Regions:
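Membrane-interfacial loop-to-helix junctions in multi-pass inner-membrane proteins
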Residues: 54, 158-166, 199-208
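Disulfide-stabilized, aromatic/cysteine-rich ligand-recognition loop
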Residues: 2-57, 61-68, 73-86, 90-123, ...
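Functional-site microenvironments in short loops/helix caps that host divalent-cation chemistry
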Residues: 170, 174-176, 180, 186-204, ...
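Polar, glycosylation-prone regions of secreted, cell-surface, and some intracellular proteins
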Residues: 126-132
Length: 491
């Protein structure tokens, strides 16, 4: 794979997506994300304030953190307002406090955290009521009654408001924390203290066996975006990338396929693992995906939100780390796709030469195309969404499970950090590792870098999914709703 430098000439523009484009629509998007947050934290104080796993924060930390983030960007950055509560920023700075340290902080009690969220939201909605179009091209708005923000360049405010970017950033941020809350529920459910919340368990479509792979011919395609108003800085700019011919599986790896890897001794065969992966496997005594266990009679169970159930063989495997995915791929004589291969298989339309916003086109996700937004607390069976297939015939690229790729998280040619370095840029460069949960030194460097994940999971909101969306995490992560699919060279 090669990127054509920083030159974006020749890039086929992707049409502007159907993202909410008015203050009223942005307000509804904010309210929708808040409904999920409040549903996942509708608990007594004890389970809200307890740390259910050193991998995660107490739920009450996430609850107030999303309010603080909203205050920072939708009140202070846009209007120049002062802090709603003194000292609030220091308490909820994710970079300052490792997750293991957060239970000891003087966090807002649940009732005060909810009151803080309501206070911030009320002020934000009042500000939204004052928005009016700016006299410049594009979807630009600003508070009509607010003077220039002290210390904030007018150009930056305009850019934050272009296409409602800053509102989309806050909406997506809250939905991402909602997915983190669900992962905490899954981890905490082992003690019987948490449930998945009040979401309705919708019936998911039946699967259909469409095993096999598709061939993606060599050639350039447009990777990333320069037009999606809600895209993060790490998705920008759109640029041309040449990808050699490759083959990629039509569907993610199933529980059935990964069980075959387990029962063939894959977790005990050092030859299949990278040195770092084998060291991690031995340290953590990995023998199967997280939440799998033997049933005592030769079968397997999966623990899902407080209950054990027979392992569903035809669902995508989830709760595997990057090292497990890599070892499985080697066992199968395959490899993980690169990030560029994944996006080309997902978005490129060879008939038009342009990239789509989603595998099926530019229309937003529907229940017929993808399993998103916590419709159910599990992935759908493989082959359940033929209507969501890409132009190459690859299915279930959006929703169900995040997918590990082979690629390190890195900047695109021409990357420019916006609106703050700590969202993307600080994660591009490998740095001295420390366990983000405990803050302990990491001499084996398992926490040194980040691998790219693509596609979204059953718990991801549709606003935080698109063909260009990039997620990233340490290669040891298993508690997230992540799986993988396999690829290989064409020759």
């Amino acid at each position: 794979m090669r990127a054509s430098g920083g030159d974006t000439s020749g890039v086929q523009p992707t049409p502007a997506p159907a993202t909410p484009g008015s203050p009223a629509a942005w307000a509804e998007a904010l309210e929708r994300s808040r409904r999920r947050t409040l549903a996942y934290t509708d608990l007594d104080d004890a389970p809200l304030t307890r740390q259910h796993s050193p991998l995660m924060s107490p739920l009450v930390w996430d609850l107030a953190h999303v309010g603080n983030y909203e205050e920072l960007w939708l009140l202070r950055a846009l209007t120049g307002a002062g802090p709603v509560l003194p000292g609030i920023d220091e308490l909820y700075d994710a970079f300052r406090h490792p997750r293991a340290d957060r239970p000891a902080l003087p966090l807002l009690p649940p009732a005060r955290a909810r009151a803080y969220l309501a206070d911030v939201r009320g002020r934000v909605l009042d500000t939204l009521d004052t928005l009016e179009p700016l006299e410049t091209p594009g979807s630009l708005t600003r508070p009509a009654t607010t003077p220039a923000v002290p210390g904030q360049a007018e150009a930056t405010v305009r850019r934050l408001l272009t296409g409602g970017f800053v509102y989309g950033m806050v909406v997506q941020h809250e939905h991402q924390h909602d997915e983190t809350l669900l992962a905490t529920h899954q981890l905490g459910a082992a003690a019987g203290t948490l449930t998945p919340g009040p979401a309705v368990e919708e019936d998911l479509p039946d699967g259909r066996r469409t095993d096999g792979e598709v061939q993606v011919p060599a050639g350039e395609f447009t990777m990333g975006t320069s037009t999606d108003p809600w895209a993060y800085d790490n998705e920008r700019p759109a640029h041309r990338v040449f990808v050699p011919e490759f083959r990629i599986d039509r569907l993610p790896v199933s529980n059935r396929a990964h069980l075959a890897f387990v029962e063939d001794g894959g977790y005990d065969d050092e030859r299949l693992w990278s040195p770092e992966g084998w060291a991690w496997r031995c340290r953590e005594r990995l023998a199967a995906p997280l939440f799998w266990r033997r049933d005592g009679g030769g079968g397997w169970l999966r623990h899902r939100f407080g209950a054990d159930e027979p392992l569903p063989l035809d669902e995508p495997v989830q709760h595997v780390c990057w090292y497990e995915a890599q070892a499985h791929a080697r066992w199968a004589g395959r490899r993980l796709p690169t990030e560029a291969e994944w996006e080309k298989a997902c978005a490129h339309d060879p008939a038009t030469g342009r990239s789509r916003r989603f595998p099926w086109g530019d229309d937003p996700p529907t229940p017929e195309r993808a399993n998103l937004g916590h419709r159910a607390t599990r992935p759908a069976p493989l082959g359940a969404y033929p209507a969501g297939a890409s132009a190459y015939g690859v299915e279930q690229l959006i929703g169900d499970v995040w997918e590990w790729t082979a690629s390190d998280f890195a900047a695109y040619p021409g990357f420019a950090s916006f609106p703050y370095r700590e969202y993307s840029e600080v994660f591009f460069r490998p740095r001295a590792g420390a366990d983000p949960g405990t803050g302990a030194p990491d001499p084996d460097q398992h926490f040194r870098g980040y691998k790219v994940l693509r596609g979204g999971s059953w718990a991801t909101d549709a606003s935080a999914t698109r063909a260009t969306f990039r997620n990233w995490d340490h290669p040891i992560r298993r508690q997230i709703f992540v799986g993988f699919r396999l690829a290989r060279n064409a020759a």
